[in-house]
Amino acid sequence: RIDEENCCLIANGNIIKVIYANNPDEIDYTQYDINDALIIDNTGSWRDEAGLSRHLQSKGASKVMLTAPGKGNLKNIVYGINHDQILPEDKLITAASCTTNAIAPVLKMLNDKFGIESGHVETVHAYTNDQNLIDNYHTGNRRGRSAALNMVLTETGAAKAVVKAVPELAGKLTGNAVRVPIPNVSMAILMLNLTTPSSKEEINEFLRLIALHSNLQNQISYTQDPDAVSSDFVGSREAAIVDSTATIVEGNRCILYLWYDNEFGYCNQVVRMVFKMAGINYRQYPEEG
């Protein structure tokens, strides 16, 4: 419920204070008994070190996480792949994008097992608030067209961003995106040329075992449902779900279809990173090592 008098949201008995400010460095968190705050910036307004550092000028602020690909030398982290790079002294971290989080774990595992010579990532992505609901002006030409009425061809930085988490894929991937008129759940199509020839059965079994028995259980899930459609994956906690019935393999050529809840699934990745940055460590099964 909403507590307008105290400017709060109350969810399951938890009080969530709403703080208004024009700039990130105007807030005094200690006024609200908040010290050593870990700030999650999902505005997208500041994506480099200089911009995000403005948060740290606020009294009571300690660390900042950006929920978008960062620019410059910021650490771009995909939890499950390179989260061990987060150090206690790090003040600014980025959680990459929902698409990067969806594709990086699968690409990492495939490259380790079979090798990836080259590939293309095509995302069929639910529309976002960056698009217009009706035809109107936009800095990106196609994104100015009505999001609710069109499939919109646009760019994605996910293929390049993957390299910051999986550097061995540098120069091997291209990417593009098609925004479609649904509110949530997207699909990444991985079209890969592998170093080692394989088969549909081998690739699927490899990914199934990873989803069941590896340390990437929270990042990679697996479905054999022949009737699966996008709405089935609303609320999925994993970063991506492999649609095994759609897998295509011909020798060195492999095409994979990954579903992902680009909202809730990504939020779960962000929460895992928050725990890491805050030093909160729950026991994981299977245990690492």
Task: Annotate each PLM feature.
Residues 108, 164, 208, 272-275:
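Generic alpha-helical structural context detector
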Residues 41, 189, 261:
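Acidic active-site catalytic centers that drive phospho-/nucleotidyl reactions
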Residues 234-289:
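NAD(P)-dependent Rossmann-like dehydrogenase/reductase catalytic/cofactor-binding core
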Residues 1-30, 115-118, 123-254:
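C-terminal substrate-binding/catalytic lobe of Rossmann-fold NAD(P)-dependent oxidoreductases
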Residues 101, 197-198, 264-265:
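A generic structural signal for alpha-helix starts
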Residues 1-133, 137-144, 248, 272-273, ...:
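N-terminal Rossmann-like NAD(P) cofactor-binding subdomain of oxidoreductases
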